Amino acid sequence: GASGLAQVLGYVRKSFGIAPGAEVTTESNPESTSPEFFEGLLEAGYTRVSLGMQSASSRVLQVLERRHTPGRPVDAAKEARAAGFEHVNLDMIYGTPGETDDDVRATLEAVLAAEVDHVSAYSLIVEDGTAMARKVRRGELRVTDEDVLASRYALIDGVLSVAGFDWYEVSNWARPDGECRHNLGYWRDHDWWGAGPGAHSHLGDRRFFNVKHPARYTQHCTAGALPIAEEEHLSPHDRHVEKVMLGLR
């Protein structure tokens, strides 16, 4: 809950400090939030909230195995704004098997009704080993055609652009001054530290990620050892290519 997130941020502030005016974002599932939750986050020092909306269609949410009701993300976003958050994001997923253009339009209408300043829209990726992948393999679900995905993306961009959102990154739209700073940091080749099981870090020419299992991660940390699972050093050429690629987003 908010108290746990407040403790984490307090530890970061005490150990490393937080720059004045820093963007401090947390992500939540809509069904796990409340007005008191958002008030606690704001009091703790969080400045931005991202909510996993996915879709306004109950049928699509069922396929995605999401637990919230179609209207909960909009209510949660309004609660966050009422608590005092200026920056609120809603995440959309498009291309779910069985989704229609009307489903996407309804989701966009709900997004605009929420009066958020940032929207992320991601094409569904069916990951190997998931229940959805097994259903696709058995023929119970059908993967959305790439041409349909392209038309849905154009639909999303068109609706958001007319509503005053600026497309500033391949999957992200924002109102003026609503751009996500940590998103921009990724694409501008900034450095970042990742803390926690499976977290990735980017420091100059070094790329590494932590062990994924929480118990193993804890064992490393309590033993005073870095919990790094794998590490990669990029050559100057690889860094240049990566910077160009990231800049194209």
List the model feature ranges, each with a label.
Residues 1-249:
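C-terminal scaffold of the Radical SAM
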